[in-house]
Structures are given as C-alpha cells and as structure tokens.
Design a protein with these regions (language model features):
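Hydrophobic/anchoring residues in structured secondary elements
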Residues: 17-19, 47, 59
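Short, surface-exposed loop motifs enriched in S/T, G, D/E and P with embedded aromatic residues
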Residues: 54-58
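Residue-level structural signal for beta-strand termini and adjacent loop
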Residues: 59-60, 99
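N-terminal non-catalytic regions of secreted/periplasmic and cell-surface proteins
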Residues: 2-43, 96-116
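Extracytoplasmic/surface-exposed domains of secreted proteins
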Residues: 27-51, 61-94
Length: 116
C-alpha cells in the first residue's frame, strides 16, 4: 500500500527523523548530515518534503547539516523527504530520499456550545 514505510531503503547519510521510523511530534526538525560527502556547492542543496514541495531549509556549513522545521504540523503520513546536492567533482546531482511516519494524534475538540 502507499502507506507502507519501507518504500525507500535508508539513505547512506545520517538523517533525522531516522528512515522508516515513526515520530510523535508533528513539527519535527527534518535534517540530513552531508559531512561525509565529497565536495559540493552549499548553495546547490535542496530539500523537498511531501505536502510542502521545495522548502526553505537552512544549511549549517560548520556542521554540514541541512535542516528544516515545518511551519505547520505534518498531517500526511508517511512523510517523504528528498534532498539533492551538486557533487562538484563528478558534476552530478546526488539524491537522498527517505520516509518517516507520524503517530496518529489524539484530537482535542473543544465543543462550541460550552459556556466559559
């Protein structure tokens, strides 16, 4: 089914949330470490997140980590993340893709007719 978490093998790069895990937080920091990658252009690093498309992820050149925090809760599970970066030596784009799940949230309804 489209909801299975094992559509993609875990990428070689360290990612968070970890590939094919389920998190409770609906606004998790989403990140990838590119510390082990050969030379790449930090201006040519992109992150796409399902339901959001291309996102404004921040790259930390010291830690070599690309990170993004969702501006609104992630509601569709699983979440697919795709990161692309330009390998300068090979002059090729490289891609890491992974998925993680969001645990079903308990909905807290406040009835409209309650007099406060």
């Amino acid at each position: 089914s489209g909801n299975s978490l094992n559509s993609y093998p875990a990428p070689a790069q360290p990612v968070y949330p970890a590939a094919n895990t389920v998190v409770k937080n609906q606004n998790p920091d989403i990140s990838i470490s590119l510390a082990r990658e050969p030379a790449f252009d930090p201006k040519q690093v992109e992150m796409r997140v399902s339901g959001f498309g291309l996102v404004n992820a921040q790259y930390d050149p010291k830690e070599k980590i690309l990170k993004w925090t969702p501006s609104r809760p992630l509601r569709l599970s699983p979440v697919t993340v795709q990161v692309r970066w330009k390998n300068l030596a090979a002059n090729l784009w490289q891609t890491a893709t992974w998925q993680f799940g969001i645990a079903e949230q308990e909905m807290h309804f406040i009835p409209q007719n309650v007099v406060k």
